[in-house]
Amino acid sequence: MSATELFARRATLARSVRLLSEFRFEQSDPARFYGALADDTAAMVADLWQAATETTPGGRTVLDVGGGPGFFAAAFTRRGMEYVGVEPDPREMHAGPAAQVGGRYVRASGTSLPFADGSVDVCLSSNVAEHVPDPWRLGNEMLRVTRPGGLAVLSYTVWLGPFGGHETGLTHYLGGARAADRYTRKHGHRPKNDYGSSLFAVSAHDGLEWAASTGALIAAFPRYHPRWAWWTNAVPGLREFVVSNQVLVLQP
């Protein structure tokens, strides 16, 4: 069984439309947006684990690098997984339900994880790589702490995709710095995802190249696309613009 066989059945057009409809609530109602994303992510990881290892995910430890305010903890706990969140910013850790839901939390950087080699079953990073200046150092750390036979799942927003600019919208096609400046003039403050400091241009090509270089890549697909559109991730150039988020699945 391929690593994506189970998740591919879930990757329908209806799912894509449902998730897309939630994006408009990211700023106004983060609990709604991140709650829906967390449920979908936990289901995706469970499917990937079961297909890749032919075992159930219950009781497995998942390390969520960049866990933020804790919306993902409840979703993984409901599936019987032991959740550990890693977040460097205490403001993020206190911006949501981290203190009220299951799981444990560690304040640390994803590029220098305070965990032993091969100490977790699953290491997940969801929409974090584009926020660090060296995303593949993050990826290497994820692989280091994942036990042999486990899974490292790195999902990130592709810069030239439609959501690459985050809250600056499609103006990122004019350039990241220019988009951030336009946002500042309009709103009177810098964007949370500020190009060059908290947002960086990460391409689909670079992610695939890094993953291939590790020798551990077992799957790569566009996270929010229906299964019949996954072919776009195999077309250089095209994938940079039509793949909004790329998932790299690695098995040490």
UniProtKB/Swiss-Prot annotation:
Q: What EC number is given for this enzyme?
A: 2.1.1.-
User: Is-annotated flag, keyword Metal-binding?
Assistant: no
Which Gene Ontology MF annotations are present?
S-adenosylmethionine-dependent methyltransferase activity
* GO BP terms: methylation
Q: Which InterPro entries match?
A: Methyltransf_11 (IPR013216), SAM-dependent_MTases_sf (IPR029063)
- Does the record carry Disulfide bond as a key word? no
Keywords from the UniProt entry: Methyltransferase, Transferase
The record's family statement is: Belongs to the methyltransferase superfamily.
Q: Which PANTHER family match?
A: 2-METHOXY-6-POLYPRENYL-1,4-BENZOQUINOL METHYLASE, MITOCHONDRIAL (PTHR43591:SF24), METHYLTRANSFERASE (PTHR43591)
Name of the protein? Uncharacterized methyltransferase Mkms_0228
**Record lineage:** Bacteria, Bacillati, Actinomycetota, Actinomycetes, Mycobacteriales
